[in-house]
């Protein structure tokens, strides 16, 4: 069930303050955050966020197409290394 429209998108306050400060100063520094749950709003366009994936911070550059999505969607938490090839010939010997 999606969030109610009357509530508006959720954005952590500390994250919004950091973006507002950078917009006032016209700077584009990387903003380190653990807030994967924050919704991307139009104020975030053009900023780079370092989103934590559980072990490191993944850089995410925000574009117009990302508005409305969550920051965590662009920082995958699981690394798939692939399945090991099943070598049937060596098992027979």
UniProtKB/Swiss-Prot annotation:
Source species, domain of life: Bacteria
GO cellular component: cytoplasm; small ribosomal subunit
GO molecular function, one term: rRNA binding
Keywords of this entry: Ribonucleoprotein, Ribosomal protein, RNA-binding, rRNA-binding
Family from the record: Belongs to the universal ribosomal protein uS19 family.
Chain's role: Protein S19 forms a complex with S13 that binds strongly to the 16S ribosomal RNA.
Protein name in UniProt: Small ribosomal subunit protein uS19
